[in-house]
């Protein structure tokens, strides 16, 4: 299906000023984006989105916001990187039950985000978002 690529291409062809004007369409006094505002905005921007397209796009925005909030919660120092120190004290049920040590659980958690080319014991926001975006497809 080439429709999503064509829509993305149309957005990009509008340049920065087009994207800025699209952003203005979504701003109201609540500083939140409703599904109705998104639908109206993409229509005014000249994009032909079906209701299903708008629903999918809105759902993707909501998922990303939830993942970003989870990362922010884990990043205790606010430096944009989750380390063992950040997640100490966030106990798994296995630790509480004595089935695993805190260190084992922390290592297992961090290893979920490591690639064969990058084993540093840290999780960046990009790694966190990439991991969870892959799970929700």
UniProtKB/Swiss-Prot annotation:
One of its GO terms (molecular function) is calcium ion binding. The keyword Transmembrane does not apply. The keyword Nucleotide-binding does not apply. It comes from the Eukaryota. Keywords: Calcium, Disulfide bond, Metal-binding, Repeat. Residues 27-48, 62-97, 100-135 form the EF-hand domain. SUPFAM superfamilies: EF-hand. Monomer or disulfide-linked dimers. This protein binds calcium. Possibly acts as a regulatory protein and not as a calcium buffer or transport protein. This is Crustacean calcium-binding protein 23. The lineage of its organism: Eukaryota, Metazoa, Ecdysozoa, Arthropoda, Crustacea.
